[in-house]
């Protein structure tokens, strides 16, 4: 009897153990995965962004833009592929996040009380202010009270942060009125202000500065807000795994200086604005560039052809017969020795000049020290194109002596004007140089380049708006291994 009881006891223990293991297994399987685990298991980071000249656009070497570069770096940290969903208006961004169709919204959007109620912000990565925009030559309101006295209403993007700002202001200014426009974006409203279709709108300071490169008639009436933080947005849940990694990611970028480099790359040149020069450039862009565009594309090689075009405009204003008292000539304003070194026989021949200028710049870029970040090498090369490689290296050495970073264009460009001052150049290997001119030279080219990008983006968006409805989104898969994906990457349109 005791043997039977002992046997039954063992059987009972086995049954109970099996049940416990089964139940434990069920609990493990039923425990929900964190957002971070889901992304890693999926192997894809899904990011929604705006198709504009700051967040994301297709350049000559594939996708680019501040938010794109950041999203790609974050996907690499996660060791997953990046799936970009670009939208043309704000209206589709947050609904897609609510439906869990994307993991992150990365679209240079400000943190507002309204957004905080529904969504979780990531770390702040720069600041913008909201500005009232009007067209030069029209009446300029100086304050909110002036806006309440207008016959013409302010027009803003529906459900934007600007609408939230105006709703608050209306509590103090009951007569403040405005119109809202759905299925559009800020850049489209800015264009309408420039063409006179509407009188006033609100825009953030960075977007306005970039758009002024295409529409120089736009001007700031006054600022409505102080600086506001810009961040990515996530779903509002108790799961903070994705946000925690984002905090770590942006912290590393700031500490390493990489975030500052990206900001310099995309809007380090926007502070200075020359109305007359920009208007002249836009006219030349429309009337002259189409004739020379094929040659810039033909000889650009690894360069973005628009960059080469911007350099040529700075040199000659796209005049193939340009000459200067110093002896430089042609579209790329080559000296005789430089022309001979790159095989140019006739500097006034536009094709030879463009080919020679591109080759000369290519050689300079190769000489720039490898300690300098790849995307910043071009600015050092341009400074060399203007004042000579030796003077550029002098500026780097001087920057280091003064406690700056000789590999940072931001630091070096600030010290270029010192090459004019005897107390500095007397100790430099190559002596005096017009460093201030080189500084302006590089920044001008960056602005012209931005204008061409913005102009092309505007034309492309016109076509896209005709082809796609507002709800249509393009999903673009960016392979982890492709730092510069080609334009011909696979694009799948979701209906």
Swiss-Prot record:
Residues 1-30 form the signal peptide. The keyword Signal applies. GO terms for molecular function: peptidoglycan lytic transglycosylase activity. SMART domains: PBPb (SM00062). It comes from the Bacteria. It is a peripheral membrane protein. Gene3D superfamilies: 1.10.530.10, Periplasmic binding protein-like II (3.40.190.10). One of its GO terms (cellular component) is cell outer membrane. Its main location: membrane. It is found in: Cell outer membrane. Keywords: Cell outer membrane, Cell wall biogenesis/degradation, Lyase, Membrane, Signal. Residues 31-270 are annotated as: Non-LT domain. It catalyses: Exolytic cleavage of the (1->4)-beta-glycosidic linkage between N-acetylmuramic acid (MurNAc) and N-acetylglucosamine (GlcNAc) residues in peptidoglycan, from either the reducing or the non-reducing ends of the peptidoglycan chains, with concomitant formation of a 1,6-anhydrobond in the MurNAc residue. Murein-degrading enzyme that degrades murein glycan strands and insoluble, high-molecular weight murein sacculi, with the concomitant formation of a 1,6-anhydromuramoyl product. Lytic transglycosylases (LTs) play an integral role in the metabolism of the peptidoglycan (PG) sacculus. Their lytic action creates space within the PG sacculus to allow for its expansion as well as for the insertion of various structures such as secretion systems and flagella. HAMAP family: MltF (MF_02016). This is Membrane-bound lytic murein transglycosylase F.
């Amino acid at each position: 009897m005791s043997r039977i009881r002992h046997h039954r006891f063992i059987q009972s223990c086995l049954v109970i153990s099996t049940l416990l293991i089964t139940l434990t297994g069920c609990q493990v399987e039923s425990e929900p995965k964190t957002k971070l685990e889901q992304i890693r298991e999926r192997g894809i980071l899904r990011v929604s962004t705006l198709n504009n000249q700051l967040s994301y656009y297709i350049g000559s070497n594939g996708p680019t833009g501040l938010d794109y570069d950041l999203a790609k770096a974050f996907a690499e940290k996660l060791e997953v592929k990046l799936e970009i969903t670009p939208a043309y208006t704000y209206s589709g961004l947050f609904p897609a996040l609510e439906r869990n169709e994307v993991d992150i919204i990365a679209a240079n959007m400000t943190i507002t009380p309204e957004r905080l109620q529904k969504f979780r912000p990531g770390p702040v990565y720069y600041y913008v202010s909201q500005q009232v925009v009007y067209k030069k030559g029209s009446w300029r309101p100086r304050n909110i009270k002036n806006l309440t006295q207008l016959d013409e209403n302010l027009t803003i993007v529906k459900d934007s942060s600007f609408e939230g700002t105006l709703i608050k202001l209306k509590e103090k200014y009951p007569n403040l009125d405005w119109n809202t426009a759905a299925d559009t974006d800020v850049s489209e409203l800015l264009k309408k202000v420039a063409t006179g279709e509407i009188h006033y709108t609100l825009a953030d300071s960075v977007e306005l500065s970039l758009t002024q490169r295409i529409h120089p008639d736009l001007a700031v009436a006054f600022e409505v807000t102080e600086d506001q933080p810009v961040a990515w947005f996530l779903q509002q849940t108790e799961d903070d795994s994705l946000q925690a990694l984002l905090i770590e990611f942006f912290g590393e970028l700031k500490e390493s200086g990489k975030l500052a480099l990206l900001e310099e790359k995309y809007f380090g040149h926007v502070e200075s604005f020359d109305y007359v020069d920009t208007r002249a450039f836009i006219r030349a862009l429309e009337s002259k560039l189409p004739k020379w565009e094929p040659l810039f594309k033909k000889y650009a090689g690894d360069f973005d052809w628009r960059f080469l075009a911007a350099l040529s405009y700075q040199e000659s204003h796209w005049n193939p017969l340009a000459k200067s008292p110093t002896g430089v000539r042609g579209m790329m304003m080559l000296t005789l020795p430089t022309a001979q070194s790159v095989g140019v026989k006739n500097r006034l021949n536009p094709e030879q000049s463009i080919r020679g200028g591109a080759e000369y710049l290519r050689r300079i870029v190769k000489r720039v020290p490898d300690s300098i970040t790849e995307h910043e090498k071009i600015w050092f090369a341009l400074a060399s194109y203007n004042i000579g490689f030796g003077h550029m290296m002098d500026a780097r050495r001087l920057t280091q002596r003064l406690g700056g970073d000789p590999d940072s264009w931001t630091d070096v460009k600030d010290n270029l004007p010192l090459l004019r001052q005897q107390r500095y150049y007397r100790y430099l290997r190559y002596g005096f140089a017009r460093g201030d001119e080189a500084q302006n030279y590089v920044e001008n080219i960056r602005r012209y380049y931005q204008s061409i990008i913005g102009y092309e983006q505007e034309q492309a968006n016109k076509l896209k708006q005709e082809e796609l409805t507002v709800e249509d989104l393009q999903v673009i898969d960016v392979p982890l291994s492709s730092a510069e994906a080609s334009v011909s990457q696979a694009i799948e349109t979701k209906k």
